């Protein structure tokens, strides 16, 4: 039930164009962080806001930022076009996401407000051309912004009025401390600033001293995750590693988990092991690999959000592992791209309409659990989190329970009522599938994905034109078969379905595939060997003898 005293968007004094964009996004009322932060920001106050993942923090700073920029252009003196707002985020994916949200909110004032994202690893010359047009809002990671400031592609000292630091609790742990301190030297002495964070830690306090001036602190009295009426959280104890694979197979193949799902594991190798295991049973899934280029990772997320596939396997090891301070940050060509913090995607990325989060591997820290679970039950949508636990992981599970239960002490991770003995008939199938997914198969699968990226890389297109033999070597290499797929494993005989589920699940029913493109149909009809149909010679009627 809506609080009658809560403040709606229409009562915040927002520009009618922003209100129209908010309506188009389907937001009937502001979230708690938006309701509290937007009026204070419009009063010109600095903000230090903490709110849980998925609570609408991006819009909480984007709406007042756009309102202040529009108001200045409408009522202030005519001045030269310049960069007025800077948004700092820890990763390239978050920069792309922030830019997208700001552009959606500015849809009806796109002529007045221009937004540029300079976080992508593009040529500096092309980004320089964008910055020379002096967009109103610039979004990027601290390292990329500092690089453009040092090259004089971007000048903020005389024009910037607003600074936003999103996911502030991650910036220092990602090794951006030195970049931030250097970047602040290029900013004016007076500006309004917003710090948005999911947690308050020592890094956030240090940022507060560097960036904010007499801020208002919003520490909302809300749980870090939605309540049980919106988010259901379960844990299931698996006696062995084999039991985890068996249970996951049953949940997905028998459609006990429906809708779009995120599967979290702790290492990239485990991601591919799980994907190859699921492929044995014709269960499609893709791996969100931090080693792949930004464009490829964003394309995976985009297709997942559009419903092209229902299952993504991800890891937060790159993002939520041990903190990496700036002075120890790796430099040079030997730096591992997979551990590059700007390549991480587990925290803060907006996966749309995720119905379930499956922690196939127990999160390494309680905070990691919070951020994984925050990918579902966003806004007012329901969600479920299911965590697989081995007997040796009970102590770590207890730490997660302690963080979730808080002062009440009431259990939050409820036991998932599942009788493993009912799916024992599937064990031999899972055992065979696990046996076929060897380390060599995993290595070949990763190699195959990298080769495909090379073939589709825009940057390498010119190289392959000059060196066609290298392209032929890639294309004519032996076909990779990461695991021996047995077609019959894609079907589930009725006698193997647990008695309690017979008639309720339809394991034979496959997801409807999109119709073949017109181009493919045309190619088939133009191929005489594929389109020719021999019907035999028809007997001609003969004239009756006279």
UniProtKB/Swiss-Prot annotation:
Principal localisation: nucleus
Bias (Basic residues): 505-524
Helicase C-terminal domain location: 230-424
Region (Disordered): 323-342, 504-546
Residues carrying Phosphothreonine: 141
Catalytic activity: ATP + H2O = ADP + phosphate + H(+)
Principal EC category: hydrolase
Domain Helicase ATP-binding: 38-218
UniProt-recorded name of the protein: Probable ATP-dependent RNA helicase DDX56
Record gene name: DDX56
């Amino acid at each position: 039930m809506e609080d009658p005293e809560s403040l709606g968007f229409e009562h915040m004094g927002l520009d009618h164009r922003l209100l129209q964009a908010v309506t188009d996004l389907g937001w009937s009322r502001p979230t708690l962080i938006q309701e509290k932060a937007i009026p204070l920001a419009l009063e010109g106050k600095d903000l230090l806001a903490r709110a849980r993942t998925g609570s609408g923090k991006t819009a909480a700073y984007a709406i007042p930022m756009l309102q202040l920029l529009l108001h200045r252009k409408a009522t202030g003196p005519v001045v030269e076009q310049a960069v007025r707002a800077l948004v700092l985020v820890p990763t390239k994916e978050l920069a792309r996401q922030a830019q997208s949200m700001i552009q959606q909110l500015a849809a009806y004032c796109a002529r007045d407000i221009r937004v540029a994202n300079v976080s992508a690893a593009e040529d500096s010359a092309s980004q320089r051309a964008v910055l020379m047009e002096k967009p109103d809002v610039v979004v990027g990671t601290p390292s990329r912004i500092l690089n453009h400031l040092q090259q004089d592609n971007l000048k903020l000292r005389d024009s910037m009025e607003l600074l936003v630091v999103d996911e502030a609790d991650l910036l220092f742990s990602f090794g951006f401390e030195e970049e931030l301190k250097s970047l602040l030297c290029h900013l004016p002495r007076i500006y309004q600033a917003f710090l948005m964070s999911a947690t308050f830690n020592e890094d956030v306090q240090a940022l507060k001293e560097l960036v904010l001036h007499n801020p208002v602190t919003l520490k909302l009295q809300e749980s870090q995750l939605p309540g049980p009426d919106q988010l259901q959280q379960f844990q299931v104890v698996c006696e062995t590693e084999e039991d985890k694979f068996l249970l996951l197979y049953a949940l997905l193949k028998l459609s006990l988990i429906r809708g779009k799902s995120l599967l979290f594991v702790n290492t990239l190798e485990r991601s591919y092991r799980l994907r190859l295991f699921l492929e044995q049973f014709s269960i499609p899934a893709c791996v969100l690999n931090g080693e792949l280029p930004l464009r490829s990772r964003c394309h995976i997320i985009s297709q997942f959000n559009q419903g092209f596939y229902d299952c993504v396997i991800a890891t937060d090891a790159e993002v939520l592992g041990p903190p990496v301070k700036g002075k120890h940050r790796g430099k040079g060509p030997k730096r591992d791209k997979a551990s590059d913090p700007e390549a991480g995607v587990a925290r803060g990325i907006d996966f749309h309409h995720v119905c379930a989060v499956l922690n196939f591997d127990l999160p390494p820290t309680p905070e990691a659990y919070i951020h994984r679970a925050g990918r579902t039950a966003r806004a007012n949508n329901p969600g479920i989190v299911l965590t697989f636990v081995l007997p040796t992981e009970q102590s770590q599970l207890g730490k997660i329970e302690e963080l979730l239960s808080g002062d009440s002490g009431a259990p939050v991770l409820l036991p998932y009522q599942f009788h493993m003995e009912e799916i024992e008939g599937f064990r031999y199938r899972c055992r065979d599938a696990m046996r076929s997914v060897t380390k060599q198969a995993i290595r070949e699968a990763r190699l195959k994905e990298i080769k495909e990226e090379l073939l589709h890389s825009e940057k390498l297109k010119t190289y392959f034109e000059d060196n066609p033999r290298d392209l032929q070597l890639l294309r004519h290499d032996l076909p990779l078969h990461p695991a021996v797929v047995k077609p019959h494993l894609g079907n589930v005989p009725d006698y193997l379905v647990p008695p309690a589920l017979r008639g309720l699940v339809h394991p034979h029913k496959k997801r409807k595939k999109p119709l073949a493109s017109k181009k493919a149909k045309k190619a088939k009809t133009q191929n005489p060997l594929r389109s020719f149909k021999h019907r035999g010679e028809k007997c001609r009627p003969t004239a009756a003898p006279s």
